[in-house]
A protein has these predicted regions:
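Terminal amphipathic alpha-helical/low-complexity segments used for targeting or macromolecular assembly
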Residues: 1-105, 110-111, 117, 153, ...
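Short helix-capping/hinge SLiMs at alpha-helix to coil transitions
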Residues: 6, 127-128
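A structural motif detector for beta-strand N-caps
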Residues: 106, 112, 117-120, 124, ...
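A generic local secondary-structure boundary/capping motif
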Residues: 145-146, 175-176, 183
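Short, small-residue-enriched loops and turns at beta-alpha junctions
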Residues: 177, 205-206
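Short coil/loop residues immediately preceding or within conserved phosphate-binding loops
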Residues: 182, 204
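Inter-heme linker and motif-flanking segments adjacent to c-type heme-binding CXXCH motifs
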Residues: 201
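Single conserved hydrophobic/aromatic residue that forms the stacking wall/gate
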Residues: 254-262
Length: 262
């Protein structure tokens, strides 16, 4: 399993606060923290950040154990708070500390796991900590970024990029800040992906393509999206981040999906 969002050993509230230079936290100093996650994917033990009033209640009521927030609020029972002037910046600090970018040293990373019978055509790049199943075909020029998981009998056509960073930015007076990505892409068995497609990794959870789904050329799938089993996605569809497409859905050419689809 790929679980960069979970710390290798639990941390404490005071340790995380010190790491990001936060002077104020609410809760016991030894309150346990086990990972980080974006608001759409949080689980018990996680830190979630929130820096917009629209999402304060959602974050405070979420499954997250620690809320990194830019406002003094009442701490919900069973949770802890870290209060800073810039939760976005500080969430990036945590991500960078526990999920740093590791440059590749070869076209196929030494720790990549490639199953029996899988064919890798010339010019394919396979990043760190990638797992590819049996009897797959990766055609020329395919890029498989760090942490990607690919099942059995998957076909990926030329020029497709799997696992690029999420398109997630915060606007500031001086420009845009990118939210660092610590998620990955999971492609289930018997998926086929056309040429020149792009599938972004999740911000802090997997972007998932379900078993048996077929994707045409020139399709973009945004971060943290979950596509069900046996879907058909035609050429030039654009699916934004955090969408959920149910099993056996058919998406026709030029579809633009901006929010949860079923």
């Amino acid at each position: 399993p790929y679980d960069k969002m979970k710390f290798s050993t639990p941390k404490t509230l005071s340790e995380i606060a010190a790491m990001i230079g936060a002077e104020k936290y609410v809760g016991p100093a030894d309150f346990p923290v086990t990972g980080i996650n974006e608001i759409h994917s949080v689980t018990h033990g996680d830190i979630v950040f929130v820096d917009h009033p629209k999402y304060y209640d959602k974050a405070l009521r979420s499954a997250a154990s620690v809320v990194l927030i830019d406002k003094d609020v009442e701490c919900p029972e069973g949770k802890a708070l870290i209060v800073t002037d810039d939760p976005f910046r500080d969430f990036n600090k945590i991500t960078h500390t526990f999920c740093p970018f590791v440059p590749s040293t070869a076209m196929i990373a030494p720790d990549a796991k490639i199953g029996r019978g899988t064919l890798i055509q010339p010019g394919v790049f396979i990043g760190n900590d990638v797992e590819i199943g049996q009897d797959c075909v990766l055609h020329a020029g395919v890029i498989v970024c760090d942490g990607t998981r690919i099942g059995d009998r998957v076909i990926v056509n030329p020029g497709t990029v799997i696992g690029g960073d999420a398109f997630y930015y915060k606007h500031r007076p001086q420009g845009y800040d990118r939210l660092l990505s610590s998620g990955n892409v999971v492609i289930r068995d018997d998926v086929e992906i056309g040429s020149l497609c792009t599938i972004d990794r999740g911000v802090s959870a997997p972007t998932t393509i379900g078993e048996g789904t077929k994707i045409d050329n020139h399709v973009h799938i945004g971060h943290d999206t979950v596509i069900g089993k046996e879907c058909l996605i035609a050429a030039q569809c654009g699916i934004a981040g955090c969408n959920h497409i149910e099993d056996k859905a058919v998406s026709y050419t030029h579809l633009r999906a901006h929010e949860t689809c079923a």
